[in-house]
UniProtKB/Swiss-Prot annotation:
Protein name per its UniProtKB record: 3-dehydroquinate dehydratase
UniProt subunit comment: Homodimer.
Taxonomic lineage of the native organism: Bacteria, Bacillati, Bacillota, Bacilli, Bacillales
Keywords recorded for this protein, A-Z: Amino-acid biosynthesis, Aromatic amino acid biosynthesis, Lyase, Schiff base
Reaction(s) catalysed by this chain's protein: 3-dehydroquinate = 3-dehydroshikimate + H2O
Family named by the database record: Belongs to the type-I 3-dehydroquinase family.
Binding site for 3-dehydroquinate: E50, W51, R52, R86, R216, S235, Q239
Active-site residues, record numbering mapped to chain: H147 (proton donor/acceptor), K174 (schiff-base intermediate with substrate)
Biological-process GO terms, alphabetical: 3,4-dihydroxybenzoate biosynthetic process; amino acid biosynthetic process; aromatic amino acid family biosynthetic process; chorismate biosynthetic process
Pathway: Metabolic intermediate biosynthesis; chorismate biosynthesis; chorismate from D-erythrose 4-phosphate and phosphoenolpyruvate: step 3/7
Length: 257
């Protein structure tokens, strides 16, 4: 298999290689539901798991978060785990933690050894440097993300976001938009294709909702390394069941070579 020089290896999978990866979210509200959902999702063999910890009601109880993360690790085995606390401003659930407390929790979860990647939002700006240092210390990969739930900005804005993520030290840059027209979907795909040629890190991009479904199925042809698919419960508008995504990816891979 030919591996792109910008691809990264996380456990046994390559992100940004020649094959698109499927990531399935886990969104349980308590430890029992998180672990049960993870068991169901892992039976479908995604390439990655994302724990959306902003759905976790006890997120302000660090001991319970760490115990749940360790339980997830035991269930996932060698499937890489992405830890995400999505802010309310970018489509996440309201949580009782301020930014400093979120960073402290991220540090604890990185040091636990239970996770492989962590998502941190581009909007945090210079504070990304603190998270970058701790992820490097803990050998955890950093995804720097930006989500536009109210529309789709200009291509130049999306490119600037991905460039900025790389400048802040991201291992992976992620951008998601909410299209209002087919033209918006094309803007996202054009930005992805241009960023793929320019940046030295893997990308994750998607257009959400029904209009954006094509980007979840064919975005990898334009440079998006990971698509998010429903394993049990959706974490964002427009996510498609993992079995359907796998079927379409297989067809596209067969006929696009």
């Amino acid at each position: 298999m030919n591996i792109s020089p910008k691809a990264i290896k996380v456990r046994n999978i390559w992100i940004g290689g020649t094959e698109p990866c499927i990531c399935a979210p886990v969104v349980g509200e308590d430890d029992r539901k998180v672990l049960r959902e993870a068991e169901e999702v892992c039976r479908k063999q995604p390439d990655l798991l994302e724990w959306r910890a902003d759905f976790f009601r006890a997120i302000d109880d660090q001991e319970r978060v760490l115990a749940t993360a360790n339980g997830l690790r035991n269930i996932a085995g060698e499937i890489p785990i992405l830890f995400t606390i999505r802010s309310e401003r970018e489509g996440g659930q309201p949580i009782p933690l301020n930014e400093a407390e979120v960073r402290r929790l991220i540090e604890a979860i990185c040091r636990s050894g239970a996770i492989d990647l962590v998502d941190y939002e581009l909007a945090y700006g210079e504070r990304i440097a603190d998270v970058r240092r701790m992820t490097e210390e803990c050998s955890v990969w950093l995804v720097v993300s930006r989500h536009y739930f109210d529309g789709t900005p200009r291509k130049e804005t999306l490119l600037a976001d991905m460039r900025q993520a790389e400048r802040y030290g991201a291992d992976i840059a992620k951008v998601a938009v909410m299209p209002k027209s087919p033209e918006d979907v094309l803007v996202l795909l054009q930005a992805t294709e241009e960023a793929r040629r320019e940046l030295a890190i893997p990308l994750i991009t998607m257009a959400m909702g029904g209009l954006g479904a094509i980007t979840r199925l064919a975005g990898w042809l334009f440079g998006s390394a990971v698509t998010f698919a429903v394993g049990n419960q959706s974490s964002a508008p427009g996510q498609i069941p993992i079995d359907d995504v796998r079927t379409v990816l297989s067809i596209l891979q067969t006929y696009s070579r």
